[in-house]
Amino acid sequence: GYASTDFAVWSEEILAVLLLLMFASGCVGSTSGGLKLMRWIVGVKVIGRELFQMIHPSSVRPMWLGRRAVKEPVVRGILIVILTYLLLVVGGTGFIAVDAHRVGIDLSISEALSGTLVVLGNIGPGFGAVGPMGGFEALPVPTKLFMCLLMVAGRLEVMTFLVVLTPSYWTG
């Protein structure tokens, strides 16, 4: 494929920033996969609200995005999507690292994490073996198939993908 630069020559600090940006994904309405920035904003606001309520237990603070109040069921749904996404990232990273190790491929956790984020968020090249100077061809077939599932999950939105996998969706 085409590559504009080799991430291996970049500093670890820059790669850490890129890894964090991979989590950020796109804005609402964009065609990017992964978690949208609005969900991260709500998640951070929930943490702030909960910390405030720990200090002031009797306080009631509604969630606001701009000038609009966000209802609690919506906040709860966003938190479920964030948690599900993070579980997929952790599980995907573990699966990719273990499966690569099983066949003798030396894949670091950061490479497995970037590979997971790349396919789940439809982002672009990852780091190291799954980076611009590498590719996915060296990965074992089960890993490639799993990454295909992660790619579909990220593109369709995580919850939509999981709903389609439930038996009750197909039976009635």
Give short role names for the model-derived ranges.
Residues 1-172:
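Membrane-proximal intracellular helices of multi-pass ion channels
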